Regions:
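Conserved AMP-binding/adenylation subdomain of ANL enzymes
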Residues: 4-44, 59
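Residue-level signal for inorganic ion chemistry
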Residues: 20, 38, 46-49, 139, ...
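Conserved helix-loop-beta element of the AMP-binding
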Residues: 24, 44-48, 61-83, 89-90
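Alpha-helix capping/helix-boundary segments
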Residues: 30, 51-53, 80, 157
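Short gly/Ser/Thr-rich phosphate-binding loop of adenylate-forming enzymes
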Residues: 35, 72-94, 101, 111, ...
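Active-site loops of AMP-binding adenylate-forming
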Residues: 60-61, 89, 93, 101-120, ...
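Conserved ATP-binding/catalytic segment of the ANL
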Residues: 125, 141-145, 149-197
Length: 197
């Protein structure tokens, strides 16, 4: 993921620096180069959009590349298709799905590998101290399975847009809920599903 995105910077890069882990950065997405880097550097975790992992799987070198070092692929930006989860699963690789924005620093929800197939298409549950709700056009909370705007509240929410008080006021309501503009729903267990971004 690009370093100018919250996922590329906070999810992997800063975390790796904090833990003293090696980090492999490539200038752009070239499926062959990514596969070669995974094999050469024994990559254990990788963050990307489903399309990135799809492009890698479609490359002729995919079937012959040693991916045995990879434990987890962290996916964001869109739901990950079951066929892609199954394809990588055949190689012993699990997926985690997340949802967030720069304004949510970085996660609003996260789905670990143990629930990846059971909650297919879900972006998971909010992290500790973070709440997610779905509202209608009148800012009224909706029930399970009802689609509406995804709103997030917690200490991870930005304080505001730099020198843009009007934009801040339209994004964060008087109760502190950040209005993402994204459409989704919660299931009966509180798992978030993204419908439109």
């Amino acid at each position: 993921a690009p370093l100018f995105h919250i996922g590329g910077l906070n999810v992997m890069t800063i975390s790796a620096f904090q833990m003293g882990s090696p980090l492999v950065l490539l200038r752009h997405l070239d499926p062959r180069a990514v596969l070669e880097a995974i094999a050469e550097h024994k990559v254990t975790h990788m963050f990307g959009a489903p399309a990135m992992f799809l492009f890698m799987s479609q490359h002729p070198a995919f079937s012959e590349t040693d991916l045995s070092s990879v434990d987890i692929l962290i996916v964001g930006a869109a739901p990950c298709p079951a066929s892609l989860i199954a394809l990588y699963g055949e190689r012993g690789i699990s997926f985690c799905q997340g949802y967030g924005l720069t304004e949510t620093s970085p996660f609003a929800s996260f789905l670990g590998p143990q629930k990846c197939l059971e909650k297919l298409g879900s972006a998971g549950l909010p992290p500790v101290h973070t709440d997610v709700r779905i509202v209608d056009a009148n800012n009224q909370p909706l029930g399970p399975q009802e689609r509406g705007e995804i709103c997030i509240k917690g200490p991870n929410i930005m304080k505001g847009y730099w020198n843009r008080p009007d934009a801040t006021a339209s994004a964060i309501d008087e109760l502190g809920w950040f209005h993402s503009g994204d459409v989704g729903y919660l299931d009966e267990e509180g798992y978030l599903y993204i419908c439109d971004r």
